[in-house]
Amino acid sequence: MTATQKKRLTTSAMIASIAAEGQPTQPAPFGHALVELARQRQDIVGLTADLSKYTDLHLFADAYPDRFFQMGMAEQLLMSAAAGMAREGFTPFVTTYAVFASRRAYDFICMAIAEENLNVKIACALPGLTTGYGPSHQATEDIAIFRGMPNLTIIDPCDAHEISQVVPAIVDHQGPVYMRLLRGKVPLVLDKYDYRYQHGKAQRIRSGKHAVIISSGLMTMRALEAAEELEKRGIDVGVVHSPVIKPLDEATILKEAGEAAIGGRLVITAENHSITGGLGEAIAATLMRHGVAPRFRQIALPDQFLAAGALPTLHDQYGISTSAMVAQIEQWILS
């Protein structure tokens, strides 16, 4: 193989870890955090729809087999059973893929769980473009679907460090929670910034004098990587991490965007989700309601069904890789 030839990607790259080569990772942070939490609290039960291994719930099943319920490929039944358990005083942690929760089980989450404001925690793997298996498995519109559901809190953690903190934080939050789950070997990013998850809060991770990126989920990792590369090019970009999409931390968003507007800085939202109905639109609506009008741009997935293929290729193609972000932001800043 010559220096100019790229390594040929195989089908395993369709489900590859989002971690960059050599990046520190932590295996199954959700599963390990839930096992530890269940050791302290007898009310916690785990339910899944034939996906325990692929949502890291198998660790809970091994540790507490009498508190684990395998519901089979029946997501609607899964949510109904969780609702019933919550009504009896249990705290169910439910796992499946994000596409199945948002598309197939929506009505059951809405009527059985959210309307009753039950204490059910729904953790869903393969959010956004974290699989190359095509539209049947890519939950690129899950936030848009769930944002309009009353009582439902939506969380999009960045990395293993944050997931480990979100799990114990949400168990005491009264009401249903939908968490976008990164599983397997999950990158460690925010520990380098002494970050601590604060439920309901967005936090500035890095300051910048030319632009600020407001991001969630894995895009905060990408935003920080892009900021480091842009700094080498003389462009100073700040990063604000907003893990809770709903209810949005409007106070922090307005403060950061307001300061950017006064200073003439660009505000950029970055999300692993369709450009329609996600974090970017939520922030844009907040700014409009309050009369804050900075220069504003979005980095997001297009409003279309996406292709199948190797994840690194797809992330480049759809503009959410670090290199694609760097090129786009540099163009915006210099134009």
Name each region found by the language model.
Residues 1-180, 185-186, 196, ...:
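Thiamine diphosphate
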